[in-house]
């Protein structure tokens, strides 16, 4: 497990502009060393179901992903999912990986059992979720997350992610 320190929680609070909720682990750190993606359990302490296991916290990262979402890439990806069976199969496997990783926490939340994030397994709705999954899981797990990640500039290069 990627432990969460008080310093990490303080950094995430600064990144989000609010107190972070139920951070289970740091799933990915930017090259600058700051948390960039966190793991959140499928049920928050207040009882709310929360299917988004991988959540991007770095404001520089989320800003460049937001810019990428304005380019029409999600529509292109959705078109390819409809016509490319290999891509659709790999994307469905990414959905399965997402659910398996979240399920490994051992927290049963029937409301989100088959729900991943970002539109998986059949469409693309949120590049933030897909990129967060790719950063956390590593390359060759989420093909569309990897594709989006490859299109991003080096968000950490000029300033740390806080």
Task: Describe the role of every protein-language-model region.
Residues 1-162:
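Preference for intrinsically disordered or flexible, low-complexity segments
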């Amino acid at each position: 497990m990627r432990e969460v320190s008080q310093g990490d929680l303080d950094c995430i609070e600064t990144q989000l502009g609010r107190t972070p909720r139920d951070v289970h682990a740091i799933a990915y750190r930017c090259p600058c060393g700051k948390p960039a993606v966190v793991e959140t359990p499928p049920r928050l302490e207040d009882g709310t179901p929360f299917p988004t296991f991988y959540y991007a916290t770095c404001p520089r990262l989320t800003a460049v992903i937001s810019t990428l979402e304005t380019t029409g890439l999600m529509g292109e990806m959705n078109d390819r999912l409809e016509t490319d069976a290999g891509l659709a199969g790999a994307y469905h496997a990414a959905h399965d990986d997402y659910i398996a990783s979240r399920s490994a926490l051992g927290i049963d939340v029937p409301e989100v059992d088959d729900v991943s994030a970002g539109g998986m397994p059949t469409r693309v709705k949120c590049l933030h979720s897909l990129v967060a999954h790719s950063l956390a899981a590593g390359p060759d797990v989420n093909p569309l997350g990897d594709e989006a990640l490859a299109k991003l500039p080096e968000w950490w290069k000029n300033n740390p992610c806080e």
